[in-house]
UniProtKB/Swiss-Prot annotation:
Coiled coil feature spans: none
Gene name of the encoded protein: trmFO
GO BP, sorted A to Z: tRNA methylation; tRNA wobble uridine modification
Family, similarity comment: Belongs to the MnmG family. TrmFO subfamily.
Annotated Gene Ontology cellular component terms: cytosol
Chain positions recorded as FAD binding sites: G7, A8, G9, L10, S11, G12
Official protein name in the record: Methylenetetrahydrofolate--tRNA-(uracil-5-)-methyltransferase TrmFO
Localization of this protein: Cytoplasm
Keyword line: Cytoplasm, FAD, Flavoprotein, Methyltransferase, NAD, NADP, Transferase, tRNA processing
InterPro entries, sorted: FAD/NAD-bd_sf (IPR036188), MnmG-rel (IPR002218), MnmG_N (IPR040131), TrmFO (IPR004417)
GO molecular function: flavin adenine dinucleotide binding; tRNA (uracil(54)-C5)-methyltransferase activity, 5,10-methylenetetrahydrofolate-dependent
Pfam families per UniProt: GIDA
Function summary: Catalyzes the folate-dependent formation of 5-methyl-uridine at position 54 (M-5-U54) in all tRNAs.
Catalyzed chemical reaction(s): uridine(54) in tRNA + (6R)-5,10-methylene-5,6,7,8-tetrahydrofolate + NADH + H(+) = 5-methyluridine(54) in tRNA + (6S)-5,6,7,8-tetrahydrofolate + NAD(+); uridine(54) in tRNA + (6R)-5,10-methylene-5,6,7,8-tetrahydrofolate + NADPH + H(+) = 5-methyluridine(54) in tRNA + (6S)-5,6,7,8-tetrahydrofolate + NADP(+)
Amino acid sequence: MKVHVVGAGLSGSEIAYQLAIRGLKVILHEMRPSKMTPVHKTSYFAELVCSNSLKSDSIKNASGLLKRELELFGSLILRVARNCAVPAGKALAVDREEFSKQVTHVIRESGIDIVIEELRYIPDSKEDIWIIATGPATSDSFASWLREKVGHNMYFFDAVSPIITADSIDYSVVFRADRYGIGNQDYLNCPMNEYEYDRFYEALINAEVLPVKDFEKDLLFERCKPIEDIAKSGKRSLLFGPMKPTGIIDPRTGKQPFAVVQLRKENLDETLYNIVGFQTRLKWGEQRKIIRLIPGLEKAEIVRYGVMHKNIYINSRKVLDPFMRLKNDRKIFFAGQITGVEGYLESVASGLYVALNVYRISKNQEPLELPKSTMTGCLLNYILKGTDTTLQPMYANYGLMGPANKNREEVAKTALRDLENFLNYSQWKEGGIRENTVKGF
């Protein structure tokens, strides 16, 4: 039996690696660089096309618990991320190019057959297993085949933030600080008074946007909502979103600014910064004009403009079984954002679940469902079995795990205990290599 993994993104790379080190014959299909997408810039595997942040490391945050669960699984992606971390307060952020380089290196050294070409359809095969992990930038031709196969798909749109050079920032205005003084001052802050905010706001809501083919506002996922759309929902909306000043004190005045634009390190060398929460579909000239209205960024050099792109996912509740296989073709699995999970590590988690069950099937064992007491189990239960027939993409969050008044540390403790027991029962750890994957880089 061969396992074909379609897409070398975060989930596809994780799956291919985990199955290969367990002795399965793995063929990884990736169309880049022979065919690029509108948002990818390199030929590396696991390229991060939106933020470089993998979110909070705190166990009190859902993403923190998810990371602990991935560590129990032995996640390659998380180990490489920690190896490529850049300072980001309580969050885990990475040097995106170094991260993708290291993942690519490991994949190429793991005995995986790599095929660089666009796959337009899945051929009929009675023996092989196929895992579709093509992600949010699935090619049009493959999406057409997929539409015929599942009878349903949906489109929504992602937007990414601009990146500027560090040496074009005016540090006499911009200052380092974390909210409430908690952290390592990893963020730069551009303060605004009310007049400056009003000027910025008026320019933003009146700026020209790029038309996006088939754009439907209702199918835009909230986290990547363009800043201009947030602004148009109300003049103060940005003050409760990406420009929230709460807990940030300007050392020049000793006071909290009216509004704050935050900048986060984009690489280890600290030569680049992304503008946090400034995903946009504005025309490039408009982006340049509006960014330079931000105090301290009057001479900002923009090395990547914000862009918006189509994002594809299936209605997993209708077409997948509890093990993420097609109901009408159990040789085809799905993983990653195409299933309706949202977020980098959420995609990895779905991939690990699929990999575990493909590994069990290869040993003639029955697939298993994850405990519902775990973050990963609750997330996948939501996308596979939610009561609403219309699936909206979902992040890991504690709300999936029961009443809001539950003690999060106790919930996390139970989740990790139950996952450890599950992984022991499933014999997952017995099949894997446990040494530090990135040793020697």
